[in-house]
UniProtKB/Swiss-Prot annotation:
Protein name (record): Ribosomal RNA large subunit methyltransferase H
Gene Ontology cellular component list: cytoplasm
Nucleotide-binding among keywords: no
EC number: 2.1.1.177
Assembly notes: Homodimer.
Location(s), subcellular: Cytoplasm
GO terms of molecular function: rRNA (pseudouridine-N3-)-methyltransferase activity
UniProt entry keywords in alphabetical sequence: Cytoplasm, Methyltransferase, rRNA processing, S-adenosyl-L-methionine, Transferase
Length: 156
């Protein structure tokens, strides 16, 4: 299965890229995880913010393949314990060829992007820095995969 994390923001610090890469490369051949970055648009007043989010949304939608099963990362989404996420990952692997997980910009995701998604996943009620979310998502998916494969990484 191909898993693509589409994230608004580029020019991340090295520790973000290294953290993401560390988890993304731990899967065996059955999962290929990659990252597509959408450039963060310049922000200023409310009008510029709306235009920036609109442009980012168009780029997110353009980055999706028609066959992608789309999951947005959103505070209003479903929370999962690690074991529940493992079951969800199993479902995605059985029912989708490719999975796209979308991390929005500072103002979140547009209605158009949310409407394209089949699901929405919340990492919890905390506000998290978007660069860190990339690493958290990669780690959570690796942990879910580890649970499904009885790998010692996850010790409940």
């Amino acid at each position: 299965m191909d898993i693509t994390i589409i994230a608004v923001g580029n020019k991340m610090p090295d520790w973000v890229n290294e953290g993401f890469s560390d988890y993304a490369t731990r899967f065996n051949a059955e999962i290929n995880m990659q990252l597509k970055e959408i450039p963060l648009q310049k922000r200023g007043d409310d009008k510029q913010i709306a235009a920036a989010r609109s442009k980012e949304s168009a780029q997110i939608l353009a980055a999706l393949a028609g066959k992608d099963y789309v999951v947005t990362l959103d505070i209003a989404g479903k929370n999962y314990r690690s074991e529940q996420l493992a079951a969800r990952l199993q479902f995605w692997q059985e029912n989708a060829r490719s999975l796209a997980l979308i991390i929005g910009g500072p103002e979140g995701l547009s209605a158009e992007v949310k409407n394209r998604a089949q699901e929405s996943w919340s990492l919890g009620a905390l506000t998290l820095p978007h660069p860190l979310v990339r690493i958290i998502v990669a780690e959570a998916l690796y942990r879910a995969w580890s649970i499904n494969h009885h790998h010692p990484y996850h010790r409940a």
